[in-house]
Amino acid sequence: MRQAHYDLPADGASLRPRAFWRLVGRLEHETLEFKRSAHHLRDAIPAMAMSAGGAIVLGVTDERDLAGRPLDQETLDRITAAASECGVEVAVREITVGRVPLTIVLVPAIRDRIVTTPDGRLLRRIGSTNQPLRGDAVSRFVRARLVT
């Protein structure tokens, strides 16, 4: 079941692993992405911002192992840099699952402007992937944003 990012635990919360997985689920989707580290956020942040917004949980492997990613200075700097490069203001939380620290990046849905990657691509979150808009899809998307 898909949970909106506002259903995630509060900053500083501590959960048992079973409660965490029950809350967020193990499947990535439009509003949830798992990443082991903060190294590859430059596509995920703008894609989520141009979709429904969502949460990026750092410290979880592709196999859904809890590897851990504390909210240390390096992690915060990487998150801030990626968000700043695409002009999105994100919120950051640190939670503990079992004894494992995880960092959650909360990405807002942006409706009043276009957000691109630092290299100018317009991405949307489709399922569990970040997909580029191409051709006529770009103009339709931009026109829809201007109408609302």
Kindly give the residue locations of the regions a language model identified:
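Conserved N-terminal catalytic/coupling substructures associated with nucleotide/phosphate chemistry
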Residues: 1-148
